[in-house]
Amino acid sequence: MECNVPVYQLRSGISRQLTTFRPDTRQKTLRVEPHQRLTLVQTEETGMVTRLWLTFPGWFWQHWNPNAEIDATLLRCLILRIYFDGNPFPSVESPVGDFFGVGHCEYRQYLSRFLGMSSGGFY
């Protein structure tokens, strides 16, 4: 589809949610092994990202058990890379914790205009 209006100025369109949930297996999570790269979303369509929500079960769910040991390095070791418009280099390359404002890898619920962290994940 040819469009002469910048995507951020579009006021109408179709909203879509891309998710890791697989109806065939009813799995909600993806397992990422050390040094493994995983593509979460890849599309050729025109559009914009309005929300990115990530949850790490082994990290968030441990906070509900005050006696559990938490591996704080997880948020420093998982690297988020976001590529746009066929660019071979990422427009975003950051540890997940830094990207969502949790650079010290400590659980702190917060809400801001653009980012937040709750017991359910990062957004």
Regions found by a protein language model. Name each.
Residues 1-123:
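Beta-strand-centric surfaces of beta-sandwich/beta-rich domains
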